[in-house]
Amino acid sequence: MAETASTETTPAAPPAEPKQKKKKQQPKKAAGGAKAKKPSGPSASELIVKSVSASKERGGVSLAALKKALAAGGYDVERNNSRLKLALKALVTKGTLTQVKGSGASGSFKLNKKQLETKVKAVAKKKLVAPKAKKPVTAKKKPKSPKKPKKVSAAAAKSPKKAKKPVKAAKSPKKPKAVKSKKVTKSPAKKATKPKAAKAKIAKAKAAKGKKAAAKK
């Protein structure tokens, strides 16, 4: 009989728990709702200044004439009626406009030429002052360049010190001259003594011969 292999039964793994999907937090809506968008284009004060400067009336521009000019340019005068009045009052208080007639927003208005002239002069002065401040910066950089030749002059001043060494060579020839002079003076003296001794010997020999000859006679 064939033996059957015993198969061990392993316990099945527990089923994986499904991952809980994180809920995306929705952005909270602003309590006040969407903010009102600012109107694109030039402001009411800018339009008023342009229309007043464009008019050629000597007595100034009235409020009714301003509204007509702005409406022709595509500006909604009926909706922005309150803004126009506030802008006119603000321009008068700043001094950009002068009120010729009436009071408040009603009346006629002109540009204040004196204030415009002062603004133009102030802008012109700023442009002239700016380049003057830049000139000293370039002037400071120029004197830095001549510093390099100083190193060359210092090196040239140090180099002549090396020429002092040949002085030692001039001292050395003095010793051999003194030695030669002593030898020359001593040698003739010795030679002079030798002939004197020889002459004395010859004289003695002659005298001895003369004595022998006299004795024989």
From Swiss-Prot:
It comes from the Eukaryota. Residues 1-45, 123-217 are annotated as: Disordered. GO terms for biological process: nucleosome assembly. It is found in: Nucleus; Chromosome. It holds the Pfam family Linker_histone. Residues 123-151, 159-217 have a biased composition (Basic residues). Histones H1 are necessary for the condensation of nucleosome chains into higher-order structures. Belongs to the histone H1/H5 family. This is Histone H1C.
